[in-house]
């Protein structure tokens, strides 16, 4: 596991914030002495002191907000990835990779096209008079040839995600074979030339080849399609390659990673509590970097929406534990061969993989084998963040993070929020501020994605290579 304590800016940030706090105390004390010497106030001394503390708190929080914003900008620039952070090339460097062509009849992933771990379920045929027709976008990329046998331009219409992946693939094709372009023989189909269940009818599938029709290239073309980010690729025929993607709606909805509200966490008191009822400040069972069970404080909710419908992956272990989590969420996986603990996206965990599960008798986390991987659609999403960056849900150890395949990078990215939580606990006016009956817990106020988590999600595409992201 990575060592989080060696972050170069962590100690400097702590010293800076402590200096701010000390300066605020000094300023408050000086102001208090001058006020007492110059005049006699009619306000009771206790109430005056409370008002001073509140004013001092607001000044400190204002400066702290500026510091957090600075850290958010500086973090991607100072981070240097560790070797154990998972697959992918380092930032700013190109690493040559050997790409192996697919063989005839091979599909990636080796699952049904309509599973959540592949392109996902069908959502319904889109016709020209359908409300969803406006969601299809034309592709006028000059590096792509469209056969367009119908002469209606239908082959240029596709979902936004399909267009994005197709454009990436077109660039890869030109790099692999100079002078050759990508050929699209079929995209959105309005004439029902395919089977009853086809993603062509939704603009989520394309049939492709190379412009020179050289069938010896098709195996590598399929591999390039996988690398471009298509969610399901099939070398189904010697004459073409078939590719499809997830729906735009499933991608845009809660990609950050969440659990179901009905899933439970174990409190330090020994009581199991549904995640939908957790509050900031609750201490729940978590996991240290070396796989030891520990209780950790909930400091915020990265996402919380009890009404949102969402697709989840379900992991069943041979010990009877069931974890329900979104596909892009990181789950702890034990590697028995190397005796190492890693974190893997939930939709990439396979049967026979081992996850860490709490032992009822000893309270320790022990490996259990995954015997079934399924999917379910459920209502509500909750993503608590603990100080440790991990949480044990339904007895299964999981990360608090998603989308990025490095637990350490994600944990460092949330360091400003942990720092903010720590400083709030040190502020002298905390008790006065929280004693007001009008104050509502953050968990009750929040409905949606936390602003900081959303900011990190938006900048990830600019600072991280694609191989590090769940796509």
UniProtKB/Swiss-Prot annotation:
Which BP terms in the Gene Ontology apply to this protein?
A: analia development; anterior head segmentation; anterior/posterior lineage restriction, imaginal disc; Bolwig's organ morphogenesis; cell fate specification; cell-cell signaling; compartment pattern specification; compound eye morphogenesis
Q: What happens when the gene is disrupted?
A: RNAi-mediated knockdown severely reduces adult survival following the ingestion of E.carotovora. Abolishes Cad99C-dependent formation of endosomes and DUOX-dependent up-regulation of reactive oxygen species (ROS) in the intestines of adults fed bacteria-derived uracil.
**Which sites carry lipid of kind Cholesterol glycine ester?**
257
Q: Which UniProt keywords apply?
A: Autocatalytic cleavage, Calcium, Cell membrane, Cytoplasm, Developmental protein, Hydrolase, Lipoprotein, Membrane, Metal-binding, Morphogen, Nucleus, Palmitate, Protease, Segmentation polarity protein, Signal, Transferase
Q: Where in the cell is it found?
A: Nucleus; Cytoplasm
Q: Where is this site: Cleavage?
A: 257-258
A GO term from the CC aspect: extracellular region
Task: Please name the CDD domains in this protein's record.
Answer: Hint (cd00081)
For the site labelled Involved in auto-cleavage, the residues are: 326
According to UniProt, residues marked as the site described as Essential for auto-cleavage are 329
The UniProt record lists lipidation (N-palmitoyl cysteine) at: 85
Q: What GO molecular function annotation could you give as one example from this UniProt entry?
A: morphogen activity
Which cysteines form disulfides?
none
Concerning Pfam families, the annotation shows: HH_signal, Hint
Q: Does the keyword Cytoplasm apply?
A: yes
Name the residues that bind Ca(2+) 2: 150, 186, 189, 191
Key word Nucleotide-binding present: no
- Describe how expression is induced or repressed: Strongly up-regulated in the anterior midgut and the posterior midgut in response to bacterial uracil.
Amino acids binding Ca(2+) 1: 149-150, 155, 185-186
| Residues annotated as site: Involved in cholesterol transfer | 303
Q: Which domain of life is it from?
A: Eukaryota
Tell me which EC number(s) this protein carries. Answer: 3.1.-.-
Assembly and oligomerization: Interacts with shf. Interacts with ptc and CG5504/l(2)tid.
**PANTHER family in the record, alphabetically?**
HEDGEHOG (PTHR11889), PROTEIN HEDGEHOG (PTHR11889:SF31)
State the family it belongs to. Belongs to the hedgehog family.
Name this polypeptide is given: Protein hedgehog
| Native source organism of the sequence | Drosophila melanogaster
| The encoding gene | hh
């Amino acid at each position: 596991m990575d060592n989080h304590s060696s972050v170069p800016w962590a100690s400097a940030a702590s010293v800076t914030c402590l200096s701010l706090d000390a300066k605020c105390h000094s300023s408050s004390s000086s102001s208090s002495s001058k006020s007492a010497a110059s005049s006699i106030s009619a306000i009771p001394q206790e109430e005056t002191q409370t008002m001073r503390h509140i004013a001092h708190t607001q000044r400190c929080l204002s400066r702290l907000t500026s510091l957090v914003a600075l850290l958010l900008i500086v973090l991607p620039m100072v981070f240097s990835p560790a070797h154990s952070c998972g697959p992918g090339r380092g930032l700013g460097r190109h690493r040559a990779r050997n790409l192996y062509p697919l063989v005839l009849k091979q599909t990636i992933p080796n699952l049904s096209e309509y599973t959540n771990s592949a392109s996902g379920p069908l959502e319904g045929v889109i016709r020209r008079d359908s409300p969803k027709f406006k969601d299809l976008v034309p592709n006028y990329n000059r590096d792509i040839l469209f056969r367009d046998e119908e002469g209606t331009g239908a082959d240029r219409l596709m979902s936004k995600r399909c267009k994005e992946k197709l454009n990436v693939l077109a660039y890869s094709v030109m790099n692999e074979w100079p002078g050759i372009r990508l050929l699209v023989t079929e995209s959105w189909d309005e004439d029902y030339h395919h089977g009853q269940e086809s993603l062509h009818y939704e603009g989520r599938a394309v049939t492709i080849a190379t412009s020179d029709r050289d069938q010896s290239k098709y195996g590598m073309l399929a591999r390039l399609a996988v690398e471009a980010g298509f969610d399901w690729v099939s070398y189904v025929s010697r004459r073409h390659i078939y590719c499809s993607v997830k729906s735009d709606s499933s991608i845009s909805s809660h990609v950050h990673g969440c659990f179901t509200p009905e899933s439970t966490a174990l409190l330090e008191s020994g009581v199991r509590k549904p995640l939908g009822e957790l509050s900031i400040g609750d201490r729940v069972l978590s996991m240290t970097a070396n796989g030891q069970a520990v209780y950790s404080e909930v400091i915020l909710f990265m996402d919380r929406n009890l009404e949102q419908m969402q697709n989840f992956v379900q992991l069943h272990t041979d010990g009877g534990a069931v974890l329900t989590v979104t596909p892009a969420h990181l789950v702890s996986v034990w590697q028995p061969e190397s005796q190492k603990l890693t974190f893997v996206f939930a939709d990439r965990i396979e049967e026979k993989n081992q996850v860490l599960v709490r032992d009822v008798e000893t309270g320790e986390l022990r490996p259990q084998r995954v015997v079934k991987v399924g999917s379910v659609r459920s209502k509500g999403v909750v993503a608590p963040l603990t100080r440790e960056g991990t949480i044990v849900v339904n007895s299964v150890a999981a990360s608090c993070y998603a989308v990025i395949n490095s637990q350490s990078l994600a944990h460092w990215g949330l360091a400003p929020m942990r720092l903010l939580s720590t400083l709030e606990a040190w502020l002298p006016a905390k008790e006065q501020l929280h004693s007001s009956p009008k104050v509502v817990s953050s968990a009750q106020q929040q409905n949606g994605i936390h602003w900081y988590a959303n900011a990190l999600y938006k900048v990830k595409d600019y600072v991280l290579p694609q191989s590090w992201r769940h796509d």
